[in-house]
Amino acid sequence: MPQRQPQPAHPADGIYFGLMSGTSMDGVDGVAVRFEAGRAPVVLAEAFVGFAQSLRDALFALQQPGDNEIDRESLAANALVARYAVCCHELQRTAGLSRDEIRAIGVHGQTVRHRPERGYTRQLNNPALLAELTQVDVIADFRSRDVAAGGHGAPLAPAFHATVFGAPGETRVVCNLGGISNITILPGGDGDVRGFDCGPANALIDAWATRHLGKPYDDGGKFAARGTVQASLLDALLDEPYFTAPPPKSTGRDLFNPAWLDARLAAFPQVAPEDVQATLTALTAVSVAREIAQHAPGCKAVFVCGGGARNPVLLDALRHALREAGVPASVDTTAALGVPPQQVEALAFAWLAYRFTARQPGNLATVTGAAGNRVLGALYPR
């Protein structure tokens, strides 16, 4: 008699891909991960596929209103998804998987508008095309359901952070330093998980490096290290009302973009470029530290993920800002918890695809401000 194959602990268990291209818009991070109910996720493969400068230019242009947007957006979405498909094929090859072994691909898309106060958020994507190119089920459009329920649609990672990084008896903060900074507060006991966007991170740091170095980012924070923080400029930047707005809140390039920076720099024409870079690095650190001091003063450990985790000058600035704010917390990357920082965001969207397949909520209403927890996403069958 043939042996029966062991059944998964939960019908949704299996291998999922997660794809995330964030506000830095330099490329897409992907992971292949196995989820089993009651067990820690197991990463089988990771990949990064960069974007050509022509695609980056198209994505940056769509951040601001312009002419012929529908045509430009659709063409950019198709080009974007072509890179997503390359990432999926690389994950499949590295992990040695057949298409039939992959339950679904969870893909975020590329945010080009985020205006929950007007009832919408727009992620550039073509999930139907991705399903066709990969012949795998695709789950996308995760943020819209939360916005429809009155939430900000962001951040969505805190529910995943709580599952993977929480520890009983210890208040932790997970800090994502992508284009925008956000934090997740894990209370370690009674109390709600909280999370929100703090302000700009690599969005402005990278833009300034591109303008003055001709490079896509400040490698290792070396440009900032050559400069000195200008206190008066930092105060002017921190005068932005978003920094003192109460959560739930979310932001993006709609607000924190080069035009926002230039408007404030107009009053400081004498500040050298390297000093501006040092001050932008301090802006990220101080805005995060102040939010932690206000909302998690007992935090003992901050774990950083996102591109900023590779910037030692930014991490040192965060340590200094936390000390100045009276928060006695250590600062490390999520690698200390067993998850490389470059994997965290893609892992979160693989997890959201897993939650969708199980028809379980993916948001935390206490984080986003939605009317309740909701199943997030939409299915595009292969």
UniProtKB/Swiss-Prot annotation:
This protein's source sits in the domain of life called: Bacteria
Q: Does the keyword Oxidoreductase apply?
A: no
Going by the record, the broad EC class of this enzyme is transferase
Query: Quick one: which residues bind ATP?
Result: G22, T23, S24, M25, D26, G27, V28, D29
Annotated pathway: Amino-sugar metabolism; 1,6-anhydro-N-acetylmuramate degradation; Cell wall biogenesis; peptidoglycan recycling
What does the function comment of this entry state? Catalyzes the specific phosphorylation of 1,6-anhydro-N-acetylmuramic acid (anhMurNAc) with the simultaneous cleavage of the 1,6-anhydro ring, generating MurNAc-6-P. Is required for the utilization of anhMurNAc either imported from the medium or derived from its own cell wall murein, and thus plays a role in cell wall recycling.
Name of the protein this chain belongs to? Anhydro-N-acetylmuramic acid kinase
Species of the source: Burkholderia orbicola (strain MC0-3)
